Amino acid sequence: NFRGYAMFLRVISSFLFFFAEKFRHVNLIIEQGNTSSKVAVYNKRHMEASFVFKKFDVEVVSSIFKKYPLTKGIFSTVIDKDDELVEYLGSNLRNFVFLDETVSLPIKVQYKTPKTLGKDRLAAAVGANYLQPGKDLLVIDAGTAITYELIDASGSYLGGNISPGMTTRFRALNLFTEKLPLVVEQEYIPLVGTDTETAIQAGVVNGIVCEMDGYIEMLRLKYPNLLVFLTGGHSFYFERRLKNSIFADINLVLTGLNR
């Protein structure tokens, strides 16, 4: 009869929901940087949510666990490891990885000192290679430091360079001189400054743009089909200032970690 059929459908629906939730792979991706932590929740390859935290500890993570049925996770940090946090994640996730030099990767790492290689740098390289496999790639990450990572078409990470980031340069000029003020980035930057403040802004910002474009042009002499990714907290600031064609992806490191 109809009631029996309706009850049967409800039972089947409940079973399917339970089955789907049980085998649903919801990943917790944590990228802990020098000044903040980016956290994302992925359902397979789809990002369901993302957060940025200045303070990041067990209390913050536990609040995320209350909202999402997390089953897997990876934790990458460029600062000292928080043992309490790592233990909490390992105890509450079915499959947890703390990213270090012992973890197997989908790219070949030719860096001579893999233990000292920043995990954010490595994750960005993995993310770029995942999005554009079989291509020569340059990844520029504009944050506290600016990093340049080179991956060839065979999927080998060849190495990279590190230079001071925009905010770091502003602070250094103020810290290591007696009279130069501490300034911040502005939307409009002249080619040549007309006072001390704009001279610093123009020098720092235009200097970084020339640096980025210079690396791209030099590397394209050897890798003519080089593709360039730009990521990092300040990527939006340089995206439209570069004369070279790029792929801007603010979540590139998270994409790499989710691999």
Segments and roles (model prediction):
Residues 49-51, 137-170, 228, 247-252:
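Glycine-rich phosphate-binding loop of actin/hexokinase-like ATP-binding domains
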Residues 106-137, 254-259:
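Conserved phosphate-binding catalytic cores of ATP/NTP-utilizing and phosphoryl-transfer enzymes
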Residues 7-20, 24-105:
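N-terminal glycine/serine-rich phosphate-binding loop of ATP-dependent small-molecule kinases
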Residues 119, 124-133, 158-201:
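Glycine-rich phosphate-binding loop plus the immediately following alpha-helix
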Residues 178, 205, 246-259:
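Glycine-rich phosphate-binding/hydrolytic loop that grips phosphoryl groups
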Residues 36, 75-84, 225-241:
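Glycine-rich phosphate-binding loops at beta-strand->alpha-helix junctions
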Residues 25-44, 128, 134-157, 173:
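Gly/Thr-rich phosphate-binding beta-strand-loop-beta motif of the actin/hexokinase/Hsp70
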Residues 51, 188-227, 234, 245-246:
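Adenine-nucleotide phosphate-binding core of ATP-dependent small-molecule kinases
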